[in-house]
Amino acid sequence: MLFRSGAGAVGLMAIIIGTRLSPHDVAGSERKRDGVKAPMPRRGFLVFGSMFFLMASSQSMFVTFGSWLEDEFGFTEAGIAGVAFALGAFELLASITSARRADVWGKERSTIAGALLIVPSGVLLALLHTHQIPGLVLLGLFLLGFEFAIVSLLPVAANIIPSAPGRGLGIVLAGGMLGRASMSVIATSAYDRYGIEWPAIIGSISAVGMIACLAWFSRGSRS
């Protein structure tokens, strides 16, 4: 069930990026291109790293929160499913809000704002994980921050190779999938040994890594 939540997030990303592409991008897909693939700019790998860390951060919670609710509070499968459903609605709200804010704040700033919500939420969850209501609220804020960030990061990814937006987006999403796969092993192992505290902390640290990569990318954009 937890992996379905992650798959739902990826599906939502695909829908959102389709709606966020400008008419120029869509028209560009119809233009004839030569056989030479557009190269990935060096700075683009900072966006690749941003996606890696952001998806790793979310995965640290996606693969562990069900076990945490069951072990710590005795949640049944139905109870965990109810929490997952509520979190999905929460994430949808964050996606809509982020899509609006990105046009006002800018894509990079909106992405960093979402990650900045993840960092304290993960740390506080590690400290308050034995308290059900605060823990659930912090889990919701953690995932809200992720959803806010991912919606804003996708247009950045689509624009790193202006002449081939699909290629740029594909490369960056591959970084995200690598982050998810890596964190699935790390987070579950950490949970088995230490409980939810370490996955929550690791998720916060990953969000800091995302902020660092994107801040570096943004600084290069302005120079």
Identify the role of each PLM range.
Residues 75-84, 131, 135, 165-169:
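Juxtamembrane helix-start elements in MFS-like secondary transporters
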Residues 43-85, 89-95:
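Extracytoplasmic gate region of multi-pass secondary transporters
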Residues 160-196, 203:
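A late C-terminal transmembrane helix in Major Facilitator Superfamily
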Residues 1, 69-70, 101-102, 186-195:
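Interfacial helix-cap and linker-helix signal at transmembrane-aqueous boundaries
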Residues 5-29, 213-218:
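C-terminal membrane-cytosol helix-exit motif in multi-pass small-molecule transporters
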Residues 18-48:
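Juxtamembrane intracellular "pre-TM" segments in multi-pass secondary transporters
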Residues 94-107, 191:
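Helix-to-loop junctions at the C-terminal end of transmembrane segments
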Residues 106-153:
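C-terminal transmembrane helical hairpin of 12-TM major facilitator-type secondary transporters
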